[in-house]
């Protein structure tokens, strides 16, 4: 649960969290340690129900996760309007991000319990639960790498601090942080273990193509372009999912509960979730700040020809797009287009970009190398993930990504991945600067206090 839901449900949440923290020490209270496949499966299904109901912030994510990410990024213009209900500065979120670090480990703990006890069992329940446990653990590590590690660097990955590599939990263990490269390898191994079990049962959510999509996202973040190309080509060619066409886009992107069209996976598919009342407030918070002019300008002189425009904004530039965390085929296209661009396969990159645009913009004319818009001056992102100045093709990919992934929690990580630009917001006469170090959240201070071998991230001194 988020800190906001905790405020409303403090008594219930305290009881739940109390139970979570004592999960590995239940015998003194007279509880029964799980032993059967069904009992271990229930641990996984509790986590899957959180995803379906919208309560999960740390695997697929929910509206609370989006509220943090979209509030701290620059797609919404905090210089025009700020409010207490919607964050506008990452520095305000330091305590909440430490709590996110702690809560993520509770999910890893549950996954490890299932992995340790169901490995080698051959029932359908055991294999389904085990594959879901590996998949969720891999996704958690991917999310921890994005949030709590510095951006990927091929030259520094063996020295940069990563995430503790935890196969099992013990009260006496105090694991230190692995390197960034070790963390990538560990997360990748979780996805491979999930895929080795041939996950096909949708009731465990994380079926083959969904696992491959998250593995591609991990490889994309860590600049493994050959792997990105292999995985994304496989998904596009063999998953049976295709880009949602213009006429069906609005219904797909603003579906309240259903997974429609090109969506591989999304949160909050339970239309009787007990959290719906809370999310109605969250939607209002996200619609309380107008989109920034730089984003709106990307839609050109005739913005309504781009189906994404009216599906995202009202006449006052306020958000109307349904804020749900999801993975869509359009993201796979964009990752593949960028991977081709980084590997010098310009025409393949252009072909993918043009195919996406034809499914979004009425009457659009395909780009060629000679007709790509020149690189603009004054944009926030001016370099790619290697620190190289943007080319017209890379800028075009970034522009489509910004329009396509608006209000899906992507922009903050694009800023982090591509240069960590420093920028500021004025509120109530004060200047709030997003410095480069703020793109990487601090690991939990309480963890550092308990385990001095844990290295805190740069910029945070307690």
Predicted regions, residues:
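Conserved, well-structured interaction surfaces
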Residues: 79-148, 178-179, 191-202, 227, ...
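Hydrophobic-face positions in mid-chain alpha helices that act as interaction patches
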Residues: 223, 227-330, 362-384, 394-396, ...
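Aromatic- and glycine-enriched pocket-lining scaffold segments that form the walls
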Residues: 198-229, 233
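Membrane-proximal, proline-rich intrinsically disordered regions
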Residues: 20-67, 232, 350, 420-462
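Sec-dependent bacterial lipoprotein signal peptides
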Residues: 1-20
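Short coil/linker segments at helix-helix boundaries
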Residues: 147-186
């Amino acid at each position: 649960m988020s800190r906001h839901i905790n405020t409303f449900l403090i008594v219930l949440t305290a009881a739940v969290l109390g139970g979570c923290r004592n999960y590995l020490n239940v015998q003194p209270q007279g509880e029964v340690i799980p032993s059967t496949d069904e009992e271990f499966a229930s641990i996984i299904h509790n986590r899957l129900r959180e995803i379906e109901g919208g309560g999960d912030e740390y695997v697929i994510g929910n509206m609370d996760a989006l509220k943090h990410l979209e509030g701290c990024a620059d797609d919404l213009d905090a210089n025009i309007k700020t409010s207490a209900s919607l964050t506008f500065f990452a520095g305000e979120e330091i305590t909440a991000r430490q709590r996110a670090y702690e809560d993520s480990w509770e999910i890893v703990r549950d996954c490890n319990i299932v992995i340790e006890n169901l490995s080698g069992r051959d029932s359908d329940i055991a294999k389904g639960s085990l594959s879901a446990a590996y998949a969720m653990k891999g996704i958690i590590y991917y999310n921890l790498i994005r949030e709590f590690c510095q951006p990927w660097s091929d030259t520094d990955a063996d020295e940069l601090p990563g995430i503790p590599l935890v196969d099992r939990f013990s009260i006496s263990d105090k694991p230190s942080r692995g390197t960034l490269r070790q963390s990538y390898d560990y997360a990748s191994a979780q996805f491979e273990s999930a895929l080795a079990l041939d996950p096909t049962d949708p009731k465990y959510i994380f079926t083959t193509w969904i696992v491959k999509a998250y593995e591609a996202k991990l490889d994309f973040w860590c600049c493994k372009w050959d792997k990105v190309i292999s995985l994304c080509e496989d998904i596009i060619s063999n998953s049976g999912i295709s880009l949602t066409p213009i006429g069906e886009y609005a219904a797909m992107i603003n579906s309240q509960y259903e997974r429609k069209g090109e969506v591989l996976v999304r949160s909050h598919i339970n239309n009787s979730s007990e959290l719906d009342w809370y999310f109605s407030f969250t939607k209002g918070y996200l619609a309380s700040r107008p989109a920034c002019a730089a984003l709106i300008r990307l839609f050109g002189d005739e913005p309504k020809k781009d189906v994404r425009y009216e599906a995202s904004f009202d006449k006052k530039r306020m958000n109307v797009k349904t804020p749900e965390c999801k993975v869509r085929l359009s993201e796979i296209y964009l990752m593949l287009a960028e991977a081709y661009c980084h590997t010098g396969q310009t025409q393949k990159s252009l072909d993918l970009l043009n195919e996406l645009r034809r499914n979004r913009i009425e009457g659009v004319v395909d780009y060629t190398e000679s007709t790509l818009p020149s690189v603009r001056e004054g944009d926030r992102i001016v370099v790619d993930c290697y620190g190289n100045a943007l080319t017209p093709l890379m800028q075009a990919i970034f522009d489509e990504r910004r329009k396509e992934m608006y209000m899906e929690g992507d922009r903050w990580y694009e800023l982090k991945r591509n240069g960590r630009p420093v920028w500021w917001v004025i509120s109530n006469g004060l200047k709030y600067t997003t410095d480069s170090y703020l793109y990487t959240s601090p690991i939990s201070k309480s963890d550092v206090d308990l385990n001095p071998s844990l290295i805190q991230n740069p910029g945070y001194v307690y």
